[in-house]
Design a protein with these regions (language model features):
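Activation on beta-sandwich/Ig-like modules and their edge loops
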Residues: 1-130, 137-140, 153-404, 430-440, ...
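A detector of low-complexity, intrinsically disordered, Ser/Thr/Gly/Pro/Ala-rich segments
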Residues: 20, 417-419, 469
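Short, compositionally biased serine/threonine- and acidic-rich segments at solvent-exposed termini, linkers
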Residues: 400-435
């Protein structure tokens, strides 16, 4: 119980419940509870029987909590942070028995995370799985101290551990971060790791208390501006699931970016109702940067840089060609847009204000120097947008000037109006202005047999700002389907036709003409006529 207020029914006290999941009695004498800031005094002489519970709290809470089960108190009981904390349980010999690092997201319930409800483990036979094995309590009192958790259920861990990222402590020491705790012995086996670039590993140490990190010590130093690749094999999690395909990670020595080595690449300043702003940055250099040493900011009404926010509270390297996104709510972002690389999205509480009409987005390095700045305006969006809400503003050319309106364009509708964590839909690749339309296959049979059921209309343009309309005609020249209407285009994309008309009725077999009109506000216009045959198998 990290946040007992507002009270539901349980006492207004913080506490931690322990369960003996072994087959033997355990004497908790001299065991300790701790968090990131320190640890408690020793526990008293208390024997916890198998499959039994005990509530641990401060001395002042004992009387209130005794109504719910057996209770022991400790001095210097850790203050359980409402928003999240790292907790560990250590034996009388100092051995870490269990550790968790909870956050508000672990409640998996926006109402209950606001207080008054316990955070409960679902399956005590699966103690290392983190958020996937915890949720808010469901007992009507707000929790179930001293008895089996109300959320108790079988929740087997069958997922392989994977690597989240890696970072360098210095030029001889690397830390690999896994997405869950790994077996400390296998994590500390040097032969389970290899690194390219002529580097050899001297030692591997599993880092307590969570054991989700391993520190590698090298025999030779890493070189600047060099990307090294680490491969991990035979490392397992607590349930002996072996690491799978996500067993490779890049590492190197980060530096501070100078002007425009890293750029503002995409801005959502006018989100959908209930949504959140986001900013995407792109590393256009051949260097490595650390998000833990970069800041996003804006300018106040006096033109002074203000509202400075760190991109990441933990080390996260941005390699050449990488993207990173900051927002206030990663769940909202994933609901509103396709996020190809969730690990590259970082939550920044209270982002700087980015007004809907105009504003400043600034990227600062660790010295406070401006790396890039974009002074956007709402009229930088595509003029024919029916509704600009939820439409991200994308940089066209990473090598172009950040302050030029012509280097920005609305994200394409065919890309979902935003491309956080991956290449912009309006990214400029070529200088010519031609467009192409191609249909595959030339003959399709929409009978749901899994073979050529749809016709795919692929397009390519060589500059942003185009709009497309597609009308499908039968062989007699009659319009049967308005497939696309005023769709803003990226540089490439596609639509599909399922062989149905505007009323979603099957069309007859035969030849159909797809009439495609592509135009922009500068008066450029291209017309395409493509033929496709709709066929069906004979019964």
């Amino acid at each position: 119980m990290a946040d007992p207020t507002p009270q539901i029914s349980l006492p207004n006290n913080e506490w931690i419940e322990l369960k003996n999941v072994s087959a033997n009695p355990i004497n908790l004498q001299n065991w300790r509870i701790g968090d990131a800031t320190g640890q408690s005094g020793p526990m008293p002489n208390f024997v916890l029987q198998p499959d039994s519970f005990v509530i641990v709290c401060t001395g002042s809470a004992v009387a209130a909590m005794q109504a719910y089960g057996r209770v022991i108190s400790v001095t210097s009981f850790p203050s359980l942070d409402n928003d999240g904390d790292q907790l560990y349980l250590k034996s009388n010999t100092g051995l870490t028995i269990h550790a968790v690092s909870y956050s508000l997201s672990w409640y998996q319930n926006a109402v209950k995370s606001d207080g008054g409800w316990t955070l409960e483990m679902i399956d005590t036979k699966n103690p290392c799985s983190g958020i996937s094995n915890w949720k808010a309590g469901t007992d009507a009192r707000g929790g179930s101290p001293g008895i089996k958790n109300a959320v108790d259920a079988v929740n087997n861990d069958q997922s392989a551990p994977s690597i989240k990222n890696a970072y360098a402590i210095d030029n001889l020491n690397i830390v690999i971060v896994f997405d869950e705790p790994v077996d400390s012995l296998k994590g500390a086996t040097v032969t389970n790791y290899s690194i390219d670039g002529g580097l050899n590993i001297q030692s591997a140490v599993s880092i307590s208390p969570l054991f989700d990190r391993v520190q590698l010590k090298l025999t030779t130093v890493m070189q600047a501006n060099t990307v090294y690749n680490i491969t991990v094999n035979n490392v397992t999690d607590c349930k002996n699931n072996s690491i799978g395909s996500k067993n490779k990670v890049k590492v190197g020595l980060p530096v501070d970016p100078t002007v425009t080595e890293m750029v503002i690449n995409e801005i959502l300043f006018n989100p959908k109702s209930g949504g959140n702003d986001y900013v995407e940055f792109y590393n256009r250099s051949n260097k490595i940067f650390d998000a833990n040493k970069l800041y996003v900011a804006n300018r106040n009404s006096s033109g002074v840089i203000s509202s400075t926010k760190l991109l990441s509270t933990l080390p996260y390297y941005i390699f050449p060609g990488d993207y990173i996104v900051v927002t206030e709510d990663v769940i909202n972002l994933s609901l509103d847009y396709m996020v190809q690389n969730p690990d590259a999205v970082f939550v920044v509480s209270s982002l700087p204000s980015f007004p809907d009409d105009e504003g400043d987005v600034i990227l600062l390095n660790s010295q406070g120097a401006v790396v890039d700045e974009a002074k956007y305006k709402d009229d930088w969006q595509f003029a024919l947008l029916a509704d600009p809400n939820g439409v991200a503003l994308e940089r066209i050319d990473p090598d172009g000037i950040s302050q030029e309106a012509t280097n920005w364009h609305s994200a394409a509708s065919t890309a979902g109006f935003g491309t956080p964590t991956f290449k912009n839909s309006q990214y400029k690749l070529l200088q010519s202005i031609n467009a192409t339309i191609e249909i595959t296959p030339k003959v399709f049979s929409p009978d749901n047999d899994g073979r050529d059921d749809i016709a795919t209309i692929q397009y390519k343009t060589t500059e942003p700002g185009y709009v497309a309309n597609i009308t499908i005609y039968d062989a007699n020249g009659r319009p049967v389907r308005n497939l696309v209407k005023n769709a803003t285009l990226g540089l490439q994309g596609y639509w599909i036709w399922d062989g149905l008309d505007d009323k979603k009725l099957k069309l007859a077999v035969g030849t159909y003409i797809l009439f495609t009109e592509i135009f922009n506000l500068s008066g450029k216009k291209e017309i395409f006529k493509n033929v496709v045959v709709l066929a069906r198998q004979l019964n």
